[in-house]
Design a protein with these regions (language model features):
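Pre-recognition alpha-helix immediately N-terminal to the DNA-recognition helix
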Residues: 38-46, 88, 92-95
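Short, Lys/Arg-enriched anionic-surface-contact patches
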Residues: 31-39, 82-88
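…primarily DNA-binding HTH/wHTH and HhH modules…
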Residues: 123-144
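Terminal helix-turn-helix DNA-binding modules in bacterial transcription factors
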Residues: 59, 78-119, 138-144
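Basic, amphipathic alpha-helical hairpins
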Residues: 1-8, 19-30, 44-57, 76-80, ...
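Base-recognition residues in the alpha-helical recognition helix of bacterial helix-turn-helix
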Residues: 71-74, 120-123
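Short coil turns linking two alpha-helices in DNA-binding domains
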Residues: 64, 68-69, 116-117
Length: 144
């Protein structure tokens, strides 16, 4: 059992390292594309300010920017390669990682990052990171 636990912890560590490398490689390309249009920066600022509200969505961003949702979608697809909704979800997940690392419960994390349903949050987190948020949280608890 101890061997299984040690091997699974090592596998998770390798997976997290690979995810970090992937993110580091992808980030400069995304950063370069979003610098081209100040509207992207405005939208990202709105996301950073409102991601924690569950009712916050692409429609909210479009309304605050006084553009149609279609225009906002085209802008994001062209400059970032993601829809505004995808970017918002990614942003929420990244913020949730930080809260889990600080020891916040899965339910508190989900609600703090704009997910109304902690079970939905867990499914999305697991699909994105390959492990449930509870395991991710425990992994950082063991390190500290």
């Amino acid at each position: 059992m101890e061997l299984y636990r040690r091997n699974s912890q090592e596998a998770v560590g390798v997976l997290l390292a690979l995810l970090g490398v992937y993110q580091d490689l992808a980030e400069p390309q995304r950063e370069e594309r979003k610098k081209e249009d100040p509207r992207i920066m405005e939208a990202m600022g709105l996301i950073a300010a409102g991601y924690h509200r569950s009712e916050f969505c692409a429609e909210t961003i479009a309304r605050k920017m006084a553009v149609s949702r279609t225009t906002l979608n085209r802008l994001f697809q062209k400059k970032i390669g993601w829809s505004p909704g995808q970017y918002l979800l990614e942003y929420r997940l990244q913020q949730s990682e930080k809260l889990l690392q600080m020891g916040m419960t899965v339910k508190q994390t989900a609600l703090s990052c704009g997910f109304e349903d902690p079970f939905y949050y867990s499914r999305v987190f697991r699909k994105h990171y390959g492990m449930p948020p509870s395991d991710y949280r425990l992994q950082f608890a063991e390190i500290q």
